[in-house]
Amino acid sequence: TDVPNLFTMNQICILSNGLETRLGAFNAGYEFFFEWLKNSEEDVIDRESIKDNALSIQYMADSLLNKETLIDYIENFILFENKHIKIIAKNHQYLGVNNLYNSFQRREELNGKIGVFWHTQGSGKSYSMVMFARKVNRKMHGNFTFLVVTDREDLDTQIHKNFVRTEVIGANDETQPKNSVQLRSFLQSNKQFIFTLIHKFGWDKVTNGNYPNLSTRDDIIVM
């Protein structure tokens, strides 16, 4: 209370007792602090060795606290939800989003298929999408459209809300087509974000003939 703004500019906090090292935001409870042990997806973690030799702080220093990595993290992997709740990327999100970003830079070589980013339930998939979209828009030139396709209305709503809460899109932006006709209209426009359920791509071939070409653009990113 004596220095209420002491942590206003703080980006990340690291806690360590030598045996265990965790990363988190200053306003988060300890249960939301997490390990950072991998510098790449290929790293194999020997937890017994790390614990026995008190190496967790060294792993943090060699990976996240590397100058280039830390600058990238601060620039692209910190979000604010509803202006007040700070959300920072976990180890798997940082590595996964950057793998997608690197693949996206090679999209022509990869025939437009930039990969699969697998998440377990509750591991922050919608925030990973936000971080990926923000980094692409911030670091790359282009007029990209991000098309987020889901198969459940609750999931579509959740992802859309997280994009709104982190101010990537506005609450009143028209980004969720109500039906197939509006979806096709959205895809013919230059909307930056579109959130849709997969069934809205449905088409009655008997009544309407062959499926139409929805867009000739090569800068639509499907997630």
Annotated model-derived regions:
Residues 17-19, 152, 196-200:
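A short beta-strand-to-loop transition that corresponds to the Sensor-1 phosphate-sensing loop
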Residues 192-223:
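Conserved RecA-like ASCE ATPase "motif II neighborhood" in helicase/translocase motors
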Residues 40-44, 174-178, 221:
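Short, surface-exposed, polar/charged, turn-prone segments marking secondary-structure boundaries
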Residues 1-145, 154, 158-170, 217:
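ATP-dependent helicase/translocase motor core
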Residues 1-2, 178-182, 205-209:
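Short alpha-helical segments and helix-capping/turn motifs at coil-helix boundaries
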Residues 91-99, 189-198:
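Conserved long hydrophobic alpha-helices within structured protein cores
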Residues 15, 149, 223:
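Generic enzyme active-site microenvironment
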Residues 147, 153-194:
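Conserved nucleic-acid-binding Ia/Ib motif block in the N-terminal RecA-like helicase ATPase lobe
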